[in-house]
Amino acid sequence: MYISRNMEQWNEFLDLMRKAFEQGKEQELLTLLLTADERDAVALRVQIVSQLLDKSLAQREIQQILNTSAATITRGSNMIKIMPPEFMDWVKQQLNHNNKNELGSD
């Protein structure tokens, strides 16, 4: 699986992210590193993955609901296919947990 052209830089980024989360500075760091459009793209990918893992809607419906392109949905779907199933189970649990928390906060 392709991760990065420069693994040393990628690992430095991951280390910085870990430190930011440990110290409660993840919001500031991601705001510094990502443009508003990039942050929106990451948030959209989370929504796409969540919808795809839920399996209650067709990809075309997800595309329409999230107002995005078929190619964007396909990229999310393709990544799900190449990730280890155990990891995807974990992601699904996290997304389901987050959705339950959001529903309970109304």
From Swiss-Prot:
Residue ranges: DNA binding: 59-82
GO biological-process terms attached to the record: negative regulation of DNA-templated transcription
Family: Belongs to the TrpR family.
Superkingdom classification of source: Bacteria
Pfam families associated with the record: Trp_repressor
Coiled coil spans: none
Keyword entries, A-Z: Cytoplasm, DNA-binding, Repressor, Transcription, Transcription regulation
HAMAP family: Trp_repressor
Role summary: This protein is an aporepressor. When complexed with L-tryptophan it binds the operator region of the trp operon and prevents the initiation of transcription.
Family matches, as InterPro entries: Trp_repress, Trp_repress_bac, Trp_repressor/repl_initiator, TrpR-like_sf
Protein name (Swiss-Prot/TrEMBL): Trp operon repressor homolog
Localization terms from the record: Cytoplasm
Main location: cytoplasm
Biological source species: Histophilus somni (strain 129Pt)
A GO term for molecular function: DNA-binding transcription factor activity
Quaternary structure, from the entry: Homodimer.
Cellular component aspect of the GO annotation: cytoplasm
